[in-house]
């Protein structure tokens, strides 16, 4: 089987975009092969469909939603167009909304891409047992994924495995398509993201996370009841977040940042 693909790097969250037509039922198994370091290697796989006069379609490997892949899809559409700037509509698995994105070429194979994200279905403060101690988390339910955001003072001092075990134990009681842990330091403006996708049974401590950045923006905006605008430093790069609050309600969230592309290639799989 010959697979055409291109590798995107949105702020370090390496993503394989499969450009060939594939059978949906085989996508999880195909993604598992492509993700192996001895094959292509990346943090995630998305299946890209582009048709004239229709939104760009991104189907993630486990049917989850991904903000970084969605904005990268807009950047790829701009790359294909040969233009230097453009607005695009993007549809992604795990999300019922068509998302509006804007992409700008900075240099060859390097773009900035921003996308208006779906608003959380719910944001609530919860207590979770972490190593025998109660800790406050913000549970941010987004289309296709639930993030558990915990504020810390210093990301370098956090025992991420202990926090992940707490989230995993908590989430085991629910049938979630995908869920994540976001350790965020408001002082440092740094975050450590982890995402688990149930369909593919994959856990990644990601280099950056778009939906996790949305979760941080939502938690900050709902906690402070005011607009949020900052750049979050992630293990593999930076993501800009902007949240607008009106009459005490969260009305809009936008994320963005750099996207790099490799060359379009083809691989033959047995």
What positions do the PLM features span?
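A glycine-rich beta-to-alpha transition motif near the start of alpha/beta enzyme domains, typified by
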Residues: 1-111, 141, 146-270
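Active-site glycine-rich loop that binds ribose-phosphate moieties when present
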Residues: 119-138, 158-167
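Membrane helix-loop-helix hairpins that form the core translocation module of multi-pass transporters
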Residues: 112-120
């Amino acid at each position: 089987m010959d697979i055409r693909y291109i590798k995107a790097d949105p702020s370090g969250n390496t993503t394989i975009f499969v450009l060939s037509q594939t059978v949906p039922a085989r996508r999880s198994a195909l993604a598992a092969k492509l993700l192996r370091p001895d094959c292509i290697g990346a943090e995630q796989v998305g299946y890209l469909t582009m048709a004239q006069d229709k939104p760009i379609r991104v189907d993630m490997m486990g049917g989850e939603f991904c903000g970084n892949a969605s904005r990268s899809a807009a950047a790829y559409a701009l790359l294909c167009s040969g233009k230097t700037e453009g607005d695009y509509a993007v549809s992604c698995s795990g999300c019922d909304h068509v998302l509006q994105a804007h992409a700008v070429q900075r240099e060859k194979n390097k773009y900035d891409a921003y996308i208006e994200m779906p608003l959380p279905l719910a944001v609530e403060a919860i207590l979770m047992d972490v190593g025998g101690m109660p800790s406050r988390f913000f549970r941010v339910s987004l289309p296709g994924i639930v993030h558990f955001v915990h504020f810390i003072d210093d990301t370098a001092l956090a025992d991420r495995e202990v926090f992940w075990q707490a989230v995993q134990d908590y989430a085991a009681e629910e049938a979630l398509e995908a869920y994540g842990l976001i350790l965020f330091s408001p002082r440092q403006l740094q975050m450590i993201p982890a995402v688990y996708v149930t369909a593919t049974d994959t856990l990644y401590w990601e280099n950056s996370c778009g939906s996790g950045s949305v979760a941080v923006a939502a938690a900050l905006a709902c906690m402070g009841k005011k607009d949020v605008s900052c750049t979050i430093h992630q293990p593999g790069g930076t993501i800009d977040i902007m949240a607008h609050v009106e009459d005490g309600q969260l009305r809009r969230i936008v994320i963005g940042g750099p996207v790099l592309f490799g060359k379009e290639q083809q691989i033959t799989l047995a």
